[in-house]
Regions:
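A short glycine-rich, Lys/Arg-flanked "PGG" loop and its adjoining helix->strand segment in the class I
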Residues: 546-562
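Conserved class I S-adenosyl-L-methionine
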Residues: 260-267
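Short beta-strand element of Class I
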Residues: 283-285
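Short glycine-dipeptide loop
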Residues: 480-484, 560-566
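Glycine-rich SAM-binding Motif I of class I
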Residues: 271-275
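Nucleic-acid modification enzymes, centered on SAM-dependent nucleic-acid methyltransferases
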Residues: 6-257, 287-521, 571-594, 605, ...
Length: 628
């Protein structure tokens, strides 16, 4: 059986093409053939036997980079399980030629047991919303069967476009209240999803409209839009060093974990690396030291939130905002809030930008806190937090209340479309468990030995980013002041935050553990280099960081199952001022040595372009693949 994995035509980075081959190789458990141009395959058997419609489908909307897909010749395997997980592919085709009596057995083996014998009389079969089967009969009784699969990830990315369609964009004329307004929007979303699924099956001869006035879903999904598609809740909040969702999802596949397994991110941040795990039937645990990161991750990973309760809470909130604005006396609380923010920011530019909006922000926050459901309250507060970040980064004349309402509506509609599509595809958004734990990855006493099926993470890159500064005002408004005890997350590398007691006893006491930690030669060489360059403070930060990372490696080794994998995304190189000159130092090998020093085997290193919005001092990343 041939399997052709056709990459998305709108890949955002050429490196994604090569990462896509890594992913499909892992999913198929074989080495695929790199296909530069798909049309050249039409000269080969069995592609030269395909009908025109199938050839048109395969060669339509191909990537214009260095390659267009990957080909494998393998025994029949369950392809449906693969299309539920694959990241970088617009379509995946399976093609096989066999005797008539074998067709049903092969279809069953690739994950399509629902096809009936009488259906094989048809030239085209649509067994489900994401599959098409094309059958061609030969005179000798054999049949050429082509199965076209639409990967779930592609459909979930495209479903975010339905909220741009006229039925969902324009406020209906008969909307007299928020209840009716949201009902009409939901009807528009559902109509758009039906249009999307129908178009993906039958709209392949339609040319997209590129200009203004787009009215058809094909105008949005059939061309490489410059707009970044934002599936699920990946982009609901700005957070330093946030990983690219496509890379994150593919990393889960490189771990070779199966449904029901559990993955761990020991430096989970805002949850980007594990947010897709529930969509793939995988359980996930994240460890995060900052309350703001944990709170964002809790929301981001909760795609199965009760939409009925959420809509009721949003309508109640909007009605409250519309009828009660500024009727409350907030002068005393507003004064206290301003003083607190002024104290921690020193009246910097961010404070000056946000100060005119603080009264309205405080009003919205108090209105949100009336919500009874804690999950919904957290969701609403995080969206408010994002507006705080936006308004503290740039001077904005617009009303923050209207901006918040618009953003909340947008995120609700994304959730609504995601849940509706999940129902159609049979994806249980609450079928897997995700737990975000406030804690320290150097002391994961909440996890037993040999219980984790795979680890993936992107730890802090030495001293490249401050994960607190851009969220400082938001942290203060949300009342997460504990996050500011370190001033900078670099302070967390210090020995006094390492502990040997239970994980939930923060802040931690001073331990002498650091003094007994042996670092590899590559780590010591870097520390000595910084010390000789009169960078005493910098050398100490780096030394603390490396010791912390070694302790984390030890804990990860302890909890990971035998022969399982740990994928770490880390900066390939780093720049420091040494003896008055900027020096670029290869830092990825230093982390690799640390992993090996606790027992891990380094089985692969994957280089790729930066997958983060906040580059800091980093240009290229390495993915270190360790195995226990």
């Amino acid at each position: 059986m041939l399997v052709l994995a056709k990459v998305k035509f709108d890949l955002r980075d050429p490196d994604e093409l090569y990462f896509a081959q890594r992913e499909i190789d892992a999913l198929l458990n074989t080495k695929t053939r790199f296909i530069k141009t798909i049309p050249t395959l039409i000269k080969e058997r069995p592609f030269n036997l395909l009908d025109d419609e199938v050839i048109h489908l395969i060669s339509r909307l191909t990537y214009m980079g260095e390659g267009q897909g990957f080909l494998a010749d393998i025994p029949p395997i369950n392809i449906v399980n693969i299309i539920k997980r694959a990241t970088f592919f617009r379509e995946i085709y399976t093609i096989f030629e066999t005797e008539e009596e074998n067709v049903l057995n092969i279809l069953k083996s690739i994950g399509l047991p629902m096809v009936k014998l009488e259906e094989l009389k048809n030239k085209k079969i649509d067994p489900n919303p994401y599959t098409q089967i094309f059958i061609k009969d030969f005179t000798d009784g054999n049949r050429l069967v082509t199965v076209r699969f639409l990967p779930f990830q592609t459909l979930f990315e495209y479903v975010t476009e339905v909220k741009k369609l006229p039925a969902a964009v324009f406020r209906p004329k008969n909307s007299e209240n928020w209840e009716t307004y949201f009902k009409e929007k939901e009807i528009g979303i559902e109509k758009g999803i039906r249009e999307l699924l129908e178009h993906m099956k039958t709209g392949h001869y339609r040319s997209p409209h590129f200009g203004l006035g787009k009215k058809h879903i094909g105008d949005f999904v059939d061309w490489a839009s410059t707009d970044l598609r934002k599936p699920f809740l990946h982009y609901l909040h700005k957070y330093k060093g946030k990983g690219d969702p496509r890379i994150s999802r593919a990393l889960i596949n490189l771990l070779k974990v199966k449904e029901g397994d559990t993955v761990l991110d020991p430096f989970v941040g805002s949850g980007a690396f594990i947010a897709d795990a529930p969509m793939m039937g995988i359980n996930a645990i994240g460890i995060e030291v900052l309350n703001i990161g944990k709170m964002i991750a809790d929301v981001k990973c909760n795609l199965g939130i009760d939409l009925i309760d959420l809509r009721k809470s949003i309508i109640k909130l909007f009605n409250l905002i519309d009828t009660s604005i500024f009727k409350q006396d907030l002068k005393a609380e507003l004064f206290d809030l301003k003083e607190k923010i002024r104290k921690y920011t020193g009246e910097n530019s961010a404070y000056k930008k946000i100060e005119p909006h603080l009264e309205k922000i405080l009003f919205i926050k108090k209105a949100i806190e009336e919500a009874e459901n804690d999950e919904i309250k957290k969701f609403l507060l995080i969206l408010l937090s994002q507006q705080v970040v936006e308004y503290s980064e740039k001077s904005r004349a617009g009303d923050i209340i209207n901006s918040f309402k618009s953003y909340l509506e947008d995120r609700y509609l994304v959730l609504y479309s995601t849940q509706k599509l999940a129902g159609i595809l049979g994806v249980n958004l609450n079928g897997s468990k995700v737990k975000i734990i406030k804690g320290d990855s150097t002391n994961m006493t909440m996890l037993k030995d040999n219980t984790i099926d795979g680890i993936l993470t992107s730890p802090p890159y030495f001293d490249a980013l401050d994960y607190i500064e851009n969220n400082k005002i938001s942290i203060l408004i949300l009342g997460l002041d504990e996050d500011l005890v370190w001033e900078s997350t670099k302070n967390f590398y210090e020995a006094k935050y390492r502990d040997e007691t239970e994980h939930n006893n923060l802040p931690l006491f001073v331990s002498d553990k650091y003094f007994s930690i042996d670092l590899p030669k590559s780590s010591m060489h870097l520390i000595e280099l910084l010390q000789k360059s009169r960078g005493t403070y910098k050398a100490k930060v780096v030394e603390n960081y490396l010791k912390m990372m070694k302790l984390s490696f030890k804990e990860c080794y302890r909890v990971l199952k035998e022969s399982k994998y740990y994928l770490m995304v880390i900066s390939k190189r780093h720049s420091w001022i040494i003896e008055g000159k900027e020096e670029v130092i290869e830092t990825s090998p230093i982390l690799a040595d640390l992993g090996r020093s606790v027992g891990f085997k380094l089985v692969d290193v994957i280089e790729h372009g930066l997958s983060k919005a906040d580059k800091g001092k980093i240009g290229v990343e390495d993915i270190l693949m360790f195995q226990k």
